[in-house]
């Protein structure tokens, strides 16, 4: 199993604002979120092969999640709505998470994290058919 642990810095981002728009985030909040998310600090701690802590810090907000592969947990969608999430291994180097809103209606959301052979961490976030890709390297 790969080790996702480390402090990660972003090197590339595609479609982040488009994904926020698909989630219904208004233009003013999108501009703030895009600026804040341009340099997130991401810390991942992995215990054994299946227990994770992920902290993402920006100038606007910090999120922390703790989860075990295969066990449902509560978190928030990227636009802050409460949801139930379930993470599974899709391959040896890639975890995928399906999210289910706790209240209300909204686009179907999910995320995945994959370690590449050259050491990059690829975060993919989806809102219905809009896909955002963010690429990180270890600091």
Swiss-Prot record:
Gene Ontology cellular-component annotations: cytoplasm; cytosol; endoplasmic reticulum; nucleus
GO MF, any single term: lipid binding
Pfam families per the UniProt record, alphabetical: Lipocalin
Residues spanning the membrane: none
Coiled coil: none
Motif Nuclear localization signal, residue numbers: 21-31
Cell compartment(s), UniProt: Cytoplasm; Endoplasmic reticulum; Nucleus
Major location (coarse): cytoplasm
InterPro entries, alphabetized: Calycin, Fatty_acid-bd, ILBP, Lipocln_cytosolic_FA-bd_dom
Cross-link for Glycyl lysine isopeptide (Lys-Gly) (interchain with G-Cter in SUMO), residue positions: 103
One GO BP: lipid transport
PTM remark: Sumoylated in response to retinoic acid binding, sumoylation is critical for dissociation from ER and subsequent nuclear translocation.
Gene3D superfamilies: 2.40.128.20
Subunit structure: Interacts with importin alpha, RXR and RARA.
Role description: Transports retinoic acid to the nucleus. Regulates the access of retinoic acid to the nuclear retinoic acid receptors.
Family statement: Belongs to the calycin superfamily. Fatty-acid binding protein (FABP) family.
PANTHER family: FATTY ACID BINDING PROTEIN
Domains as described in the record: Forms a beta-barrel structure that accommodates hydrophobic ligands in its interior.
Protein's name according to its UniProt entry: Cellular retinoic acid-binding protein 2
Organism listed in the record: Rattus norvegicus
Gene: Crabp2
